[in-house]
Swiss-Prot record:
It comes from the Eukaryota. GO terms for biological process: learning or memory; long-term synaptic depression; long-term synaptic potentiation; protein localization; protein localization to cell surface; protein phosphorylation; regulation of AMPA receptor activity; synapse organization. Required to maintain a pool of extrasynaptic AMPA-regulated glutamate receptors (AMPAR) which is necessary for synapse development and function. Regulates basal AMPAR function and synaptic transmission during development but is dispensable at mature hippocampal synapses. Plays a role in regulating basal phosphorylation levels of glutamate receptor GRIA1 and promotes GRIA1 and GRIA2 cell surface expression. This is Proline-rich transmembrane protein 1. The chain crosses the membrane at residues 224-244. The lineage of its organism: Eukaryota, Metazoa, Chordata, Craniata, Vertebrata. Residues 40-49 have a biased composition (Basic residues). It comes from Rattus norvegicus. Component of the outer core of AMPAR complex. AMPAR complex consists of an inner core made of 4 pore-forming GluA/GRIA proteins (GRIA1, GRIA2, GRIA3 and GRIA4) and 4 major auxiliary subunits arranged in a twofold symmetry. One of the two pairs of distinct binding sites is occupied either by CNIH2, CNIH3 or CACNG2, CACNG3. The other harbors CACNG2, CACNG3, CACNG4, CACNG8 or GSG1L. This inner core of AMPAR complex is complemented by outer core constituents binding directly to the GluA/GRIA proteins at sites distinct from the interaction sites of the inner core constituents. InterPro entries: CD225/Dispanin, CD225/Dispanin_fam. Residues 276-296 dip into the membrane without crossing it. Residues 15-36, 87-111, 121-138 have a biased composition (Pro residues). Residues 64-79 have a biased composition (Low complexity). GO terms for cellular component: glutamatergic synapse; membrane; postsynaptic density membrane; postsynaptic membrane; synaptic vesicle membrane.
Length: 306
C-alpha cells in the first residue's frame, strides 16, 4: 500500500499546486508491448489481444515526473487493471497481472489499420471504362461475288458483301438505252434461221413523258400560190414582192440554207397578206363609191326633169 500511495520520493520537495486545481498536460501514451504472432486457428479475428497489463501513470503531486518515475519502477508504482479475457489461452499467460488487479482493454495503435483476413474469393474489380470496339480486320482475300455487265467491253465485280475488293474497281457507265421505233404498218419478219418467217404488224410503241422521237425538220412554206392570187386579184405591187420572196425560199432550200429559207418564207407570207388586205379594202371602197355615184346621178336627173 505504501508503494501505491507514494508518487515521488520524500526527498523531492512538493513545488506544484494541488493536482485537482490546475489542468495537466496530456500524458504520452504508453509504449505497447510487443505482440505475439496469432495462432492458426484465430486468423479470423483481430490481432490486438495479447497477454500483459496496461500501465496507467498515476497523476500525483509530481505530474509528469511521477508518471516517468512510475514507468521506470514498473508495476510496483503503477495502477494495473485486469483485462477481460478475449479468446485467452486456457492457461495463465506469462506476465499476467494478479487476479485482484483491474485491466482495461488495449486498443490497437491505429484502428483503421487493423489486419483482418477474410476467407473466400476476392471481390470482382470495378468495371473499366467502355473501350471502343476493335477495328474490323481488313479483308485479305477477294470475297466471292458476281459479275455485273455494265458496258460493252467493261465488266465489274460486285462482291456479296456490298464492297469492291481492292484491285478490282467497279466500272459503271451511264445507261445508253436504244428504244426501237417502228412506224405504223411496217411489217417485220421474225423466225429462226432456216425456218419460215412470221410477218406481223405491230402498233407503234407508246411514247412516255421522257421519250421524244427525233423527227426530221419540215422545210418552210414558200407561199407561192397565195402570192400569185393576191397579185392578180387584189393589189399587184405588194403581190409582186410576195412572189419574189417565194422564189427566194425555193432557192435557199435548194442550197440547204434553212435559216434564209425561213426568213424569206415569213416575208412572202407578210406581203401576201398585205396584198390581200389592200385588195379587200379597195373592193369595199369601190363598192361604196359606186353606190354614192349612182344615188347622186338619180338625184340629178330628178332635179332637171320638167
Amino acid at each position: 500500500m505504501s508503494s501505491e500511495k507514494s508518487g515521488l520520493p520524500d526527498s523531492v520537495p512538493h513545488t506544484s499546486p494541488p493536482p485537482y486545481n490546475a489542468p495537466q498536460p496530456p500524458a504520452e501514451p504508453p509504449i505497447p508491448p510487443p505482440q505475439t504472432a496469432p495462432s492458426s486457428h484465430h486468423h479470423h479475428h483481430h490481432h490486438y489481444h495479447q497477454s500483459g497489463t496496461a500501465t496507467l501513470p498515476r497523476l500525483g503531486a509530481g505530474g509528469l515526473a511521477s508518471a516517468a518515475a512510475g514507468a521506470q519502477r514498473g508495476p510496483s508504482s503503477s495502477a494495473t487493471l485486469p483485462r477481460p479475457p478475449h479468446h485467452a489461452p486456457p492457461g495463465p499467460a506469462a506476465g499476467a497481472p494478479p487476479p485482484g488487479c483491474a485491466t482495461l482493454p488495449r486498443m490497437p495503435p491505429d484502428p483503421y489499420l487493423q489486419e483482418t483476413r477474410f476467407e473466400g474469393p476476392l471481390p470482382p474489380p470495378p468495371p473499366a471504362a467502355a473501350a471502343p470496339p476493335p477495328p474490323a480486320p481488313a479483308p485479305t482475300a477477294q470475297a466471292p461475288g458476281f459479275v455485273v455487265p455494265t458496258h460493252a467491253g467493261a465488266v465489274g465485280t460486285l462482291p456479296l458483301g456490298g464492297y469492291v475488293a481492292p484491285g478490282y474497281p467497279l466500272q459503271l457507265q451511264p445507261c445508253t438505252a436504244y428504244v426501237p421505233v417502228y412506224p405504223v404498218g411496217t411489217p417485220y419478219a421474225s423466225g429462226t434461221p432456216g425456218g419460215p418467217g412470221v410477218t406481223s404488224t405491230l402498233p407503234p410503241p407508246p411514247q412516255g413523258p421522257g421519250l421524244a422521237l427525233l423527227e426530221p425538220r419540215r422545210p418552210p412554206h414558200d407561199y407561192m400560190p397565195i402570192a400569185v392570187l393576191t397579185t392578180i386579184c387584189c393589189f399587184w405591187p405588194t403581190g409582186i414582192i410576195a412572189i419574189f420572196k417565194a422564189v427566194q425560199v425555193r432557192t435557199a432550200l435548194a442550197r440547204g440554207d434553212l435559216v434564209s429559207a425561213e426568213i424569206a418564207s415569213r416575208e412572202a407570207r407578210n406581203f401576201s397578206f398585205i396584198s390581200l388586205a389592200v385588195g379587200i379594202a379597195a373592193m369595199v371602197l369601190c363598192t361604196i363609191l359606186t353606190v354614192v355615184i349612182i344615188i347622186a346621178a338619180q338625184h340629178h336627173e330628178n332635179y332637171w326633169d320638167p
